Amino acid sequence: SGVLPTIISRCLVFSIPPLGGKQVERWLIKERNVAPDTARVLSKMSCGDPGLALDYLENRENLKVFAEAFVSSMKISFKKDFQGLHLWVEELGSWGRGQTQEYFTFSSTVISEIAKYKSMGSGEVIFDWFPEISFKTEGFSKLLKYSYLPMFMSVFDEGKIDIGRNLNPKIVLFDAGIRMMEIF
């Protein structure tokens, strides 16, 4: 166990850019026989990453957990509910680092989708795939000002990076929650 960090620090990591949403959408339809509507949602949510899209397809319940956590965080942030923030941090703090990073990626993608929805007046958002989750995209899009977008993206991107740096997930999540409260 003492040698593993040394080995990892000597490894070279190559970031491979995602294929792109349209290519992943076509691949899901052709190779996995996924319905076009589902393929479109999955390609958007995976940001063009076929592995993540396939993971979401095969593990819908994992995606539902992220959607519920996102909705909860937005409600807590808007209400400036510190008690709720504490409970949310405790719940998400028990997740693994990889799952927490995926949550931050998921959240930034959702904010982007909602911004597109706001600018176009319609469109698909991940919550369309989960009718059992109570989230009013139209109502939230009215609260979301375009000036908030860089701040939201910064919170989610920095959270993902901080988790990758092995910072304490509870501290990162609490910081993200406080910063989101400041945005509203």
Language model regions located:
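Charged, glycine-rich active-site and insertion segments that engage polyanionic ligands
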Residues: 2-106, 117-184
